[in-house]
């Protein structure tokens, strides 16, 4: 159902996205922007909708974005606050917002060109927002169509094959450090990035893999330990941190012991980082900044024809949305 006031999109109220990505920012800056956007969510209250909130927050390893139907002044205010960090955020409105999310969902705006993980991340961000709020029709329409067309784009072979990925980087790093394939590996968090790395390493012959999550996962074929039973004194040779807000999920006393095993390696995939930078041993630790640098060196350039193809699809959906809103406006005027 189209909500009253949505016919104003493109005038005083905009459908827009503001954010930063790996292109403009370091990991630390993305963490700071994430904090700003989290604090600002309560400000996205377009009076014309008479709703408390109307936004979708997309936070991944390489991007932090907030999508909303809101007055332009709110986007401007956020942009000014982010600029105080020394960062220039991008802001796309209306049809350009459509084009941006379609390219994001299709893997064409990713550091790992053509990656599939972003599709799931976009879907989870949308579903979480839909559970917590009464989203506007425009946001439902935007995310549903972007997810649909991202999937279609991949199925047709439009998305390039991601030959250089985070699992491949991890595999190469373990080989460089001569980590034995019988070594014990611990994955904290059942995130998609942790799963992709774990299954890749198992295919490469690593056999002692343990997952730690909030609760037992009945379908998981690997060893498991619940968080309450986690102990860093156990001889885990490599630890992978891949859960959101992980820094606060475990007691401080437990984190203090993560370096007690000599030569233990830690991969921190979390954003914000699970381990503050001043607490780590640099030669035994990799965060998303270091991983991003490696990926950037090996990144393929996006095919402009692929970009144009997805953008054209996005523009058609934007026009379709406007036609629906105009029809609703006409019906309301004649009622």
UniProtKB/Swiss-Prot annotation:
One Gene Ontology biological process: protoporphyrinogen IX biosynthetic process
Superkingdom to which the source organism belongs: Bacteria
Keyword NADP annotated: yes
InterPro entries linked to this entry: 4pyrrol_synth_GluRdtase, 4pyrrol_synth_GluRdtase_N, GluRdtase_CS, GluRdtase_N_sf
UniProt KW keywords: NADP, Oxidoreductase, Porphyrin biosynthesis
Record site: Important for activity: 100
EC nos: 1.2.1.70
Binding residue positions for NADP(+): 189-194
Gene Ontology MF terms: glutamyl-tRNA reductase activity; NADP binding
Residues bound to substrate: 60-63, 110, 115-117, 121
Enzyme class label: oxidoreductase
Pathway: Porphyrin-containing compound metabolism; protoporphyrin-IX biosynthesis; 5-aminolevulinate from L-glutamyl-tRNA(Glu): step 1/2
Record carries keyword NADP: yes
Catalytic residues (positions): 61 (nucleophile)
Catalytic activity: (S)-4-amino-5-oxopentanoate + tRNA(Glu) + NADP(+) = L-glutamyl-tRNA(Glu) + NADPH + H(+)
Entries under Pfam families matching the protein: GlutR_N
Family that this chain belongs to: Belongs to the glutamyl-tRNA reductase family.
Extra remark beyond the main annotation: During catalysis, the active site Cys acts as a nucleophile attacking the alpha-carbonyl group of tRNA-bound glutamate with the formation of a thioester intermediate between enzyme and glutamate, and the concomitant release of tRNA(Glu). The thioester intermediate is finally reduced by direct hydride transfer from NADPH, to form the product GSA.
Domain-level remarks: Possesses an unusual extended V-shaped dimeric structure with each monomer consisting of three distinct domains arranged along a curved 'spinal' alpha-helix. The N-terminal catalytic domain specifically recognizes the glutamate moiety of the substrate. The second domain is the NADPH-binding domain, and the third C-terminal domain is responsible for dimerization.
Subunit structure: Homodimer.
Function: Catalyzes the NADPH-dependent reduction of glutamyl-tRNA(Glu) to glutamate 1-semialdehyde (GSA).
Name used for this protein in its record: Glutamyl-tRNA reductase
Species whose genome carries this gene: Chlamydia trachomatis serovar L2 (strain ATCC VR-902B / DSM 19102 / 434/Bu)
